[in-house]
Amino acid sequence: MKKDEFELLDPIQSQKKPFLVCCVEEPSAREMLLGVLPRLGLREWEDFQIMVFQGKQDLEKRLELRLRAWQRPQSVFLILRDQDSGDCKAVKQGLFWKLMASGQTGLVRIACRELESFYLGDLQAVANALAIPALAQYQNSQKFRGPDNLNNAKQELQKLTGFHYQEVSGSRQIAALLSLSLDPPINRSHSFQALLQGILQLLAQGEK
């Protein structure tokens, strides 16, 4: 696996399982992770914790301070933010600098361009979660073959579901059913695949 330039991983692996701390900008991202992490064998509070910031500006402003103040040993950090209209590399670089300045171990992942791109990458999960079976057939359409390229993924998902998708409750329903397969990858969102790979990298910090 190619190493990401925005990763700070400890080359000296310990025998103790790391504690994963996820830093996210909004409650919907928390719900997404709560649907994914337990299926990777992690238990909230015992194996992981999610810090929810009050939007992007709050994340950018307070991230370094929160990371510096963190005291739990053997912790590794996952920082997740939407790209939105920003330059992906610039957004990632800015967060990486804050991680580096804090002295903590971890990595940065960006949802290209919005969290909903993860869901548009697995329309079968959306169809099952929202009980709209016909949705799955749209996965091979040109628009949804590469959901990371959509500038308005949230709006697209709302229209596609007849506005049945709501950010927090929809994330809770859909994330629990998202495919976590990486070999072969099922989800068409490359940024979701990168997120899963990053989580597995962080967890591997505690393996011999």
Short names for language-model regions:
Residues 1-20, 30-51, 57-208:
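C-terminal accessory helical subdomains adjacent to catalytic cores in phosphodiester-
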Residues 25-26:
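Helix N-cap/beta->alpha junction signal
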